[in-house]
Every structure is written in C-alpha cells, then in structure tokens.
Amino acid sequence: MKQGIHPEYKEITATCSCGNVIKTRSTLGKDINLDVCGNCHPFYTGKQRVVDTGGRVERFNSRFKIPSTK
C-alpha cells in the first residue's frame, strides 16, 4: 500500500439502543449509535411477525376475475 493516502483505521464502539456494546474497527474514527443489533432485531430474537397478504391477493384476483388456484 502507498503511504499517506489511506484513512486511519481506528477502534470504535457501536452502541445499540438496547444497550448492547460492540467494539469494532472503522475509518469513521468516532463512536456510533445503532437502532438495532443482533441481540434485539426481531429476526434474530424469534419475535418476527409474518404479514398475511392473503386478503390483498384475493382482492386482486376478484378484481381481475382470476380463478382461485386452491
């Protein structure tokens, strides 16, 4: 690598809104705040909700007179 053209790589702390603290390295050079992390994200905690779009599909099919495949 050429000297003097690359940004400085520093250790920073990423703090989540749930209180989880993650130490990492970045060229940003300052600590950051996160909205979600692996400890509080619904996908990783198992609290994910499935959105049912069946009503919208049925409405579309009835609007365009497409027979149901069920």
From Swiss-Prot:
Which cellular component appears as one GO term in the record? ribosome
Q: Which InterPro entries has this protein been placed in? A: Ribosomal_bL28/bL31-like_sf, Ribosomal_bL31, Ribosomal_bL31_A, Ribosomal_bL31_sf
- What Gene Ontology biological process does one annotation of this record name? translation
Give me the segments passing through the membrane.
none
For this chain's record, the cofactor binding note is: Binds 1 zinc ion per subunit.
Q: Needs which cofactor?
A: Zn(2+)
Q: Which family does it belong to?
A: Belongs to the bacterial ribosomal protein bL31 family. Type A subfamily.
Q: What does this protein do?
A: Binds the 23S rRNA.
**PANTHER family xref list:** 50S RIBOSOMAL PROTEIN L31, CHLOROPLASTIC, LARGE RIBOSOMAL SUBUNIT PROTEIN BL31A
What name is this protein filed under? Large ribosomal subunit protein bL31
- Source species of the chain: Haemophilus influenzae (strain ATCC 51907 / DSM 11121 / KW20 / Rd)
Q: Which gene encodes it?
A: rpmE
